[in-house]
């Protein structure tokens, strides 16, 4: 059973849903979307009662956007999947649940009303301030000094007004303070099967331009990243799910690794990489992650990665520069020419997303500097 919502559904995912005939919840958004299907078949739209029956009969659930979680929690609140959603979306509750895996990890939950009066003098620095529920780096701040704290509190007030996500996605009433997690950051698309066993579908390394950078500009994957991390991540997720208890459940998980130490940043329930960027796996090694999960299949990475040694596959998020002039336009020809091999370019115009779009690229060892350049660029060099 598929739940679609704004802000974005890729043509790749939409075409898969049309061709496969998977049941999709009928909403004004999906009715509009059905008329834009790349294939000749429309979406298989089902009304609320039939959708609920399918879900309760054991059909696997998947959503492209966490904006759709409200319906699931409202109509299916007594199902095990709803319990897993609640646990994963509440970062403070998840920290408490997993605390025995890392008993020395510092974290503290604070009501928004108490942020300005909280004494932070004894907290280990750097630390991170973020909403207990959040998405798309909304309200996430790295604090190294008292001045950083002051600026973060000002930004919290501003973010609360400007956030375009519903309350269930970005809850600005409770905040989590936690020690800064050092090490390399990764994002993992996986599902837990009917026995609760983790099945990893893709592993991204999240690259940053600096210590204070919290943007989503660049995610990379490839043979080297997957082979180095697949065994240890699978073992770690097995320990985690012994506490969460998810079954037949997809998730997109962000974590950091320092040496042999793995620490979670956040769990995003019932979906894979946001804004349909999970499609990266199809471009990188021919794997449709959603189809693999819905059909309970397990990827054979030895086969999928054959012949791809030395290749890096990237998802580049083209976020708009701050204070962008209203008449500014992206020079797409110049942008695409900056990369060795663009697998797909997705340019979008969605008011609620401050993005030009996304690029999926393939890069060999001799051209990795192109990734360093785009990571640090504010994209003004590609405007006219």
For each feature predicted by the language model, list its residue ranges.
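N-terminal basic/disordered segments at the start of proteins
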Residues: 2-20
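Conserved N-proximal alpha/beta basic substrate-recognition cap immediately N-terminal to
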Residues: 29-122, 363-376
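ATP-grasp fold ATP-binding core
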Residues: 98, 123-142, 162-183
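Conserved ATP-binding module of the ATP-grasp superfamily
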Residues: 104, 146-182, 243, 374, ...
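Glycine-rich phosphate-binding loop of ATP-grasp-fold ATP-dependent ligases
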Residues: 127-157, 185-189, 209-225
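ATP-dependent carboxylate/phosphate-activation module, predominantly the ATP-grasp catalytic core
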Residues: 179-182, 189-245, 268-297
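Conserved metal-phosphate-binding beta-hairpin within the catalytic cores
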Residues: 241-278, 305-312, 317-324
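Peripheral (often C-terminal) accessory segments that flank ATP-dependent C-N-forming ligase machineries
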Residues: 294-384
């Amino acid at each position: 059973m598929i739940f679609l919502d704004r802000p974005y559904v890729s043509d790749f995912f939409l075409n898969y849903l049309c061709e496969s005939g998977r049941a999709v919840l009928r909403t004004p958004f999906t009715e509009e979307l059905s008329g834009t299907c790349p294939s000749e078949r429309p979406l298989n739209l089902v009304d609320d009662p039939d959708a609920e029956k399918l879900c309760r009969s054991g059909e696997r659930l998947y959503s492209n956007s966490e904006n759709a979680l409200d319906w699931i929690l409202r109509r299916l609140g007594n199902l095990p999947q709803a319990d897993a959603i609640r646990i994963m979306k509440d970062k403070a509750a998840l920290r408490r649940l997993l605390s025995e895996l890392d008993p020395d990890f510092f974290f503290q939950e604070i009501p928004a009303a108490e942020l300005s009066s909280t004494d932070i003098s004894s907290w280990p620095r750097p630390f991170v301030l973020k909403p207990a529920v959040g998405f798309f780096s909304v309200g996430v701040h790295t604090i190294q000094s008292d001045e950083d704290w002051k600026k973060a509190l000002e930004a919290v007030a501003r973010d609360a007004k400007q956030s375009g996500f519903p309350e269930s996605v970005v809850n600005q009433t409770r905040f989590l303070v936690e020690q800064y997690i050092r090490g390399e950051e990764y994002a993992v698309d996986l599902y837990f099967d009917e026995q609760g066993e983790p099945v990893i579908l893709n592993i991204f390394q999240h690259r940053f331009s600096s210590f204070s950078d919290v943007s989503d500009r660049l995610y990379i994957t490839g043979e080297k990243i997957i082979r180095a991390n697949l065994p240890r991540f699978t073992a770690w997720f097995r320990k985690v799910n012994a506490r969460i208890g998810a079954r037949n459940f997809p998730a997109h998980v962000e974590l950091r690794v320092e040496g042999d130490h793995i620490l979670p940043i956040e769990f995003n329930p019932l979906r894979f990489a946001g804004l349909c960027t999970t499609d990266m796996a199809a471009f990188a090694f021919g794997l449709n992650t959603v189809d693999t999960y819905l059909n309970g299949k397990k990827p054979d990475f030895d086969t999928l990665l054959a012949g791809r040694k030395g290749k890096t596959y990237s998802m580049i998020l083209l976020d708009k520069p701050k204070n962008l002039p209203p008449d500014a336009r992206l020079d797409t020809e110049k942008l695409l020419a900056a990369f060795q091999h663009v697998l797909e370019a997705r340019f979008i115009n969605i008011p609620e997303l401050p993005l030009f779009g996304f690029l999926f690229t393939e890069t060999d060892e001799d051209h990795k500097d192109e990734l360093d350049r785009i990571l640090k660029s504010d994209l003004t060099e590609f405007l006219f």
